[in-house]
Amino acid sequence: MIKPRGENQIQYLHNILTHDISFGIGPAGTGKTFLAVAAAVEALERQEIRRILLTRPAVEAGEKLGFLPGDLGQKIEPYLRPLYDALFEMLGFERVQKLMERNVIEIAPLAYMRGRTLNDSFIILDESQNTTVEQMKMFLTRIGFNSKAVITGDVTQIDLPRSTKSGLRHAMEVLSKVSELSFNYFESKDIVRHPVVAKVVQAYEEWEAQDEIRRQETAAQRRAEREQKVRSENETNLGE
């Protein structure tokens, strides 16, 4: 069994085991996807579920996978590589291949899940910050009886067009008070990769926070200038 590190990972794994739907939100390297896969593998080993389903939005391909060469697995394999890596580390390459041949482990692009009901399954939606609101709702309503779902993502790494709201951000707002769901948040201090990764993430977080302050100050200054201009024009008009 994979052992969690740190309080946030311990709580996250506990929530996965005690909730049917759990969200793991935070930067890369915090173990949110790895622990979800570990929980799925353990549930399969204990015969608590019949299959593991891995999915993520293929934003880079616009989910137009029909234009890519190969069968379905080959088309979306590059987008699911982090999940494969976790599975291979836990079960070994050959066993994963055999389980996939029997559809015990299934991979599917998010766009292909519409219309399905997933019973007796452990479903992991990775990179969920790149889902649209409609895709997130569709995914959450696919979950059937005796199934668990873990949704992982990083709201600082959204690849959607600026005009498109992230389904993960929307879910965080809409579902935060649903007690049957768990929301688990990770920070740069929770990163369990090379120590320099945590420092890199922290540096970016600090820069982004300062950049947001700068943008707000610039916007406030522009508003003040516009208001001053309007007042000056009004005073000029009154003088005439």
Positions of predicted regions on the chain:
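Conserved helicase motor core of SF1/SF2 NTP-dependent helicases
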Residues: K3-L125, Q129-E240
